[in-house]
Amino acid sequence: MSGKSIFDKLWDRHVITGDEGQPQLMYVDQHYIHEVTSPQAFQGLRDAGRKVRRPDLTFGTFDHNVPTVNIFDIRDAISKAQIDKLAENVIEFGIDNASHGSDKQGIVHMVGPETGRTQPGKFIVCGDSHTATHGAFGAIAFGIGTSEVEHVFATQTLWQVKPKKMLVEFTGKPQKGIYSKDYILALIAKYGVACGVGYVVEYRGEAIDRLTMEERMTICNMSIEFGSKMGIMNPDQTTYDYMRGRECVPEDFDAAVADWKTLVSDDDAEYDKVIRMDVSELAPMVTWGTNPSMGVDFDTPFPEVRDMNDERAYHYMGLRPGQKAEDINLGYIFIGSCTNARLSDLQLAARIVKGKKISPNLTAIVVPGSRPVKRAAEKIGLDKIFKDAGFEWREPGCSMCLGMNPDKVPDGVHCASTSNRNFEDRQGFGAKTHLCSPAMAAAAAIAGHFVDVRRMPEVQ
């Protein structure tokens, strides 16, 4: 009998009933909620006269709709209603939360790891497609719909069919100026946004082992853009060092670590599909089109039109085949989102812009992903570096990642963004989004267009 992958081991731990290949009832260890996908689920509970079965395993955040300038000045009626309703619901149902304006407030996929609620071995769900972020800790984590949110509220369980397994192995050592965001964008550009459909993706390899937890979260975060709702990594000493001392980790932390060490994939584990990518061959990535697979490295011209999707993307973006990333006239820079708004992301960007000024006629904003990150950044003076360079330093939230709050890119304007999606109108009606690493976004803010960060002395 072959060995088991980490996913197999975690799945087996959480099956309550059901046969493999059929829907199985799974126990949920941690349920994260936010203001957008929870109101109808709470109302369903209320209508049925039910309670939240395990409020102690549920945690709420306020992130998608919150303004990042005056955080309580919510002018959109729907956004305000969703914020107010979550505030009411967490009180009514006895759910702990990082309340709007609190010291812990932030994006759900930031707050979970920061508080230590996200742990190896857990089965984690949230009504948000980027829940795979938490898989970087060695957890099964994925997004669910509102009806499933209600089901978890009521039962602390979820019916799921076990997916196939894919191994993505990142090998080699990257050049300077190449980051984990480039790894995942390069993977998606090469294999497409549907490659991971029906699979859980396990990321591993020497290039993963060298990454910090914050860098690993960036890769797992964009599993959904690769087509997979689940991404997972094996926990290791880097994981345990990140978690030690956080608020919600197990009291007997060493005993927990001993258990977590048994969860890693066996050497003879088998996979349904295997992909290998040598990161030493990568260059900085930038997307040119309207889905994350429409990306090229800095050295490569935009491709010829291959189908109607390309034709539509070029028309929407106002670009043409043969151009290069440096030809894009940028008007906005966004450094933030659950993909790249952690302290290390901000430190990287600050090193590049320190002592410089952003390009004239360009708007650049930095949005820390959580209030703890904002405080930590301000403690070491990052806010001053950004403001001196001409950036706007904002309050935490999802911000310009999506057009669901006041932070929007104007119609027709190109934005270098550290977020995860570049769909039509994603950052505002007519907004033209280019996904990239924090280093590429910061350097572009100074130049007014994309530049090769490998050539910058500030980049390590």
From Swiss-Prot:
Q: What enzyme category does the UniProt record give? A: lyase
Concerning CDD domains, the annotation shows:
IPMI
Please state the Enzyme Commission number of this protein: 4.2.1.33
Q: What GO terms in the biological process aspect are recorded for it?
A: L-leucine biosynthetic process
Q: Where does [4Fe-4S] cluster bind?
A: C338, C398, C401
What the entry lists under Pfam families is as follows: Aconitase
Q: In which pathway does it act?
A: Amino-acid biosynthesis; L-leucine biosynthesis; L-leucine from 3-methyl-2-oxobutanoate: step 2/4
**Keywords assigned by UniProt?**
4Fe-4S, Amino-acid biosynthesis, Branched-chain amino acid biosynthesis, Iron, Iron-sulfur, Leucine biosynthesis, Lyase, Metal-binding
On cofactor binding, the record's note says:
Binds 1 [4Fe-4S] cluster per subunit.
Recorded superkingdom: Bacteria
Q: Is 4Fe-4S among this UniProt entry's keywords?
A: yes
Q: Which cofactor does it need?
A: [4Fe-4S] cluster
Q: Note whether Amino-acid biosynthesis occurs among the keywords.
A: yes
Describe its assembly: Heterodimer of LeuC and LeuD.
Reported function: Catalyzes the isomerization between 2-isopropylmalate and 3-isopropylmalate, via the formation of 2-isopropylmaleate.
Record family assignment? Belongs to the aconitase/IPM isomerase family. LeuC type 1 subfamily.
What is this protein called in UniProt? 3-isopropylmalate dehydratase large subunit
* Native source organism of the sequence: Streptococcus thermophilus (strain ATCC BAA-491 / LMD-9)
